[in-house]
C-alpha cells in the first residue's frame, strides 16, 4: 500500500470542514488521505467519498495508546506521514456559572490535548524525512471570546501558543506549523439557525455573509503546498472581517 503520493492524516474527516478539506486534498490526485472518525459509521462515509484516494480509520484522538496503535498501522502500511491536519473538535456550550467540570474537561481534552497527542505522533517521522506540514483548525472565538464558550475559547487560544512554540522547534527541521482560524462558516449547524439568529451573526461580519467550507479547504491546500514553505507559526484568519488582528 506504500505510495509515492503524499500522505495526509485528517482528524474528524467524516463531516463539515474535515470532510471538505479531505475531499479537496484527495481531488489533487497526488495526496492519499487517511481520515479519522470516532465511529464506524463515520469511517464508512469517509471511505465512500475518498474511494481509491484514501481510507477512513476509527480513532479516539483523546486516547494516546489508541493513537500510537493507529499511527503504527499508518507507518507500516503507508510508510510515512507528510501532512497532519488537526480538525476534529467539540463544543459543550454553557455560561461558566452553569458549566460542569465535565463540560470543561471534555472540550479541553478534545480541542487541546488531542492536538498534543496527534502532533507528537507524527513529528519524529517528519523530522526523519526532513519535511512535513502540520495545520490545525482554530477559531475566531479564540481571539474575540463568546458568551457560553469559556472552555472552547480557552482551548483554541491555547493552541495558538502551542503552535508558535512547536513552529520554533520544528522550523530547523524543514517542518511548518500553522493554524487556520475560521469565522462563521456555512455548515449543517448554521443551516439550522433561524433567520433572526443568522441576521444577528451577519451583523458582526463586515462582508455580510458566511464563509464556505471550500474557502477553508483552499487555504489548507495552499498551506500544505510548496508555495507556503516559508510560512510557519502563523494563524491565518478567515472571517469576512469579523476579526482583524
Curated annotation (Swiss-Prot):
Keywords: Calcium, Fatty acid biosynthesis, Fatty acid metabolism, Lipid biosynthesis, Lipid metabolism, Metal-binding, NADP, Oxidoreductase
Pathway annotation: Lipid metabolism; fatty acid biosynthesis
Lipid biosynthesis in keyword set: yes
InterPro entries: NAD(P)-bd_dom_sf, Sc_DH/Rdtase_CS, SDR, SDR_fam
Residues at which NADP(+) binds: 12-15, 38, 60-61, 87, 152-156, 185
Residues at which Ca(2+) 1 binds: 51, 54
UniProt: Ca(2+) 3 binding residues: 234-235
Biological process, per Gene Ontology: fatty acid biosynthetic process
Catalytic activity reported: a (3R)-hydroxyacyl-[ACP] + NADP(+) = a 3-oxoacyl-[ACP] + NADPH + H(+)
GO molecular function: 3-oxoacyl-[acyl-carrier-protein] reductase (NADPH) activity; metal ion binding
Active site as annotated: 152 (proton acceptor)
Extent of the signal sequence: none
EC number: 1.1.1.100
Residue numbers binding substrate: 139
UniProt binding sites for Ca(2+) 2: 146
Family the entry assigns: Belongs to the short-chain dehydrogenases/reductases (SDR) family.
PANTHER family linked to this entry: 3-OXOACYL-(ACYL-CARRIER-PROTEIN) REDUCTASE, 3-OXOACYL-[ACYL-CARRIER-PROTEIN] REDUCTASE FABG
Subunit structure: Homotetramer.
Free-text function comment from the UniProt entry: Catalyzes the NADPH-dependent reduction of beta-ketoacyl-ACP substrates to beta-hydroxyacyl-ACP products, the first reductive step in the elongation cycle of fatty acid biosynthesis.
Other information: Calcium ions stabilize the structure, and may inhibit FabG activity by obstructing access to the active site.
Protein name stated in the entry: 3-oxoacyl-[acyl-carrier-protein] reductase FabG
Gene assigned in the entry: fabG
Amino acid at each position: 500500500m506504500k505510495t509515492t503520493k503524499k500522505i495526509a492524516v485528517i482528524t474528524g474527516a467524516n463531516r463539515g470542514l474535515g470532510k471538505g478539506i479531505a475531499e479537496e486534498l484527495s481531488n489533487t490526485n497526488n495526496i492519499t488521505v487517511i481520515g479519522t472518525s470516532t465511529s464506524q459509521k463515520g469511517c464508512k462515509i469517509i471511505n465512500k467519498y475518498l474511494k481509491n484516494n484514501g481510507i477512513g480509520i476509527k480513532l479516539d484522538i483523546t486516547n494516546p495508546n489508541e493513537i500510537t496503535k493507529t499511527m503504527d498501522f499508518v507507518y507500516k502500511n503507508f510508510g510515512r506521514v507528510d501532512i497532519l491536519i488537526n480538525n476534529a473538535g467539540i463544543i459543550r456550550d454553557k455560561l461558566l456559572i452553569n458549566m460542569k467540570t465535565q463540560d470543561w474537561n471534555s472540550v479541553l481534552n478534545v480541542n487541546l490535548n488531542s492536538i498534543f497527542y496527534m502532533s507528537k505522533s507524527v513529528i519524529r517521522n517528519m523530522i526523519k524525512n526532513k519535511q512535513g506540514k502540520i495545520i490545525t483548525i482554530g477559531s475566531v472565538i479564540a481571539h474575540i471570546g463568546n458568551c457560553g464558550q469559556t472552555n472552547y475559547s480557552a482551548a483554541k487560544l491555547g493552541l495558538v501558543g502551542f503552535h508558535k512554540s512547536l513552529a520554533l522547534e520544528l522550523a530547523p527541521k524543514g517542518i511548518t506549523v500553522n493554524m487556520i482560524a475560521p469565522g462563521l462558516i456555512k455548515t449543517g449547524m448554521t443551516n439550522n439557525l433561524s433567520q433572526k439568529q443568522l441576521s444577528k451573526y451577519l451583523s458582526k461580519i463586515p462582508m455580510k455573509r458566511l464563509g464556505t467550507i471550500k474557502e477553508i479547504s483552499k487555504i489548507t491546500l495552499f498551506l500544505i503546498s510548496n508555495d507556503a514553505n516559508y510560512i510557519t507559526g502563523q494563524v491565518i484568519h478567515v472571517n469576512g472581517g469579523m476579526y482583524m488582528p
